[in-house]
Structure formats: C-alpha cells, structure tokens
Amino acid sequence: MAVISMKQLLEAGVHFGHQTRRWNPKMAKYIFTERNGIHVIDLQQTVKLADQAYEFVRDAAANDAVILFVGTKKQAAEAVAEEAKRAGQYFINHRWLGGTLTNWGTIQKRIARLKEIKRMEEEGTFELLPKKEVALLNKQRARLEKFLGGIEDMPRIPDVMYVVDPHKEQIAVKEAKKLGIPVVAMVDTNADPDDIDVIIPANDDAIRAVKLITSKLADAVIEGRQGEDADVDFAQEAQADSIEEIVEVVEGSKND
C-alpha cells in the first residue's frame, strides 16, 4: 500500500514542475510531459519513490539516527519546523550558515553561547545588568535562535538529512556529501539529482506539496522510533489508471 496516494499528490499540486526553460536535463526521466510551458512530474514515480524514502527514513530512525530537516525558503519554513518537532528531530528553516556541518565545532560554540544567554536570564543575571547590555544580549539571543534554535539540542552531526529544494540548499547538500551523510530530498524539475541519495520528484514551491511530503517523512521517523506501525495516515485511495487522464482533469498553478 502506498504511503502517499496519487489523489493526495494531485490535490497538493506535487505534479507541477518549473517552466520548461528552467529545467535541469538530468531530471528528464522524472518528467511525464509538458503543458503550457510547464513540466509535469511523473507522479507514478513519485508514489514509488516516496515509498522508498519513507522506508529509508523509517529504518534510519529505528536505528536511532539523528535526522536534520532543512528548508529555508518561505514555502517550506513552517512545515519543516513543525514536522521536525513532531518527529522529535532537528531543523534549519532560515538561512543555512556555511560550515554548519563541516565546521560543527564552531557551530557548537555558538549554540553554547545561546544556552549561556538563556541561562543568564533564567538565573536573574539580566536584572543586575544595565538595560543597554540586556538589550544587546536579547538581540544576540534572537539572532542565534533564528539560525540555530532548531539544532540547539542536536547531539551530533546528523546521520540523515532531509532537504526541501536541494537547488536552493546546495551548500547544505555539498556539506552533507563531503561528510558522507545521506540526503533525502524533494527534487523539482530545476534541480540536479546527482548529489541526492534518496530522490522524491516533487513540486518544492507549493506549501501544500511541501507539507504533504514532509509530514509523511516525519511519520516515518515516528514509526521507526516506535518500532511498530505508527498511527500514520497511509493512503487508502485507489491509484488512478492513467497519469495522462489525471493531467487532463487537474487544473491549478504551481504555487499554493
């Protein structure tokens, strides 16, 4: 039984790729057709590959993997944070700081500073400091929380990284590749799939599409951690007979 049904993918607009002039030819095998200057992703492949991604993440979680969710574009930021938290994992949903993985020691020092500032406030140290200094500390904390809050409690560099839009998150993907960290990603028609270990061909620009895929991978983590079938919403709907028929009946725009 598929983790995500064709109907769910269609309703979320997962099939809408980029304009044909913006495509990456390496994504050709995941493209079904072209309509009105837009590439249409082959959802039959997305269904199959989403299953594989689910199994990969579930099995990693079952082995106590640390999983980092990455999505810094506005369409992804909320879903990435919410689903990572729900799965008890970690996230980066604002700008990726160069060296987050490859210079983990330095990042840990910045996280330690964030925790120190929080501790100062909790212990009442702020009350003893001049208002100007407190304002500067609050500003520093806000900035550190924005960029590092999602990995504040991450015990080590991740064992697996899930990425929304590897085209935008090229630096993150390169760092993971350098360290041998497998990458699971939503890959749109403009991206290079070569550096992605587990590909999910999908529209990564629509909020609903990002939420759908990301939530399913969070379900995979939860199931893996529980060591048994989690209470996840497996797709019950029958698959459509023909993707060509589906393309004809679905209308909508790429962006949610």
From Swiss-Prot:
GO terms for molecular function: structural constituent of ribosome. PROSITE patterns: RIBOSOMAL_S2_1. InterPro entries: Ribosomal_uS2, Ribosomal_uS2_bac/mit/plastid, Ribosomal_uS2_CS, Ribosomal_uS2_flav_dom_sf. The keyword Ribonucleoprotein applies. GO terms for biological process: translation. GO terms for cellular component: cytosolic small ribosomal subunit. Keywords: Ribonucleoprotein, Ribosomal protein. Belongs to the universal ribosomal protein uS2 family. This is Small ribosomal subunit protein uS2. It comes from Streptococcus agalactiae serotype Ia (strain ATCC 27591 / A909 / CDC SS700). The lineage of its organism: Bacteria, Bacillati, Bacillota, Bacilli, Lactobacillales. The gene is rpsB.
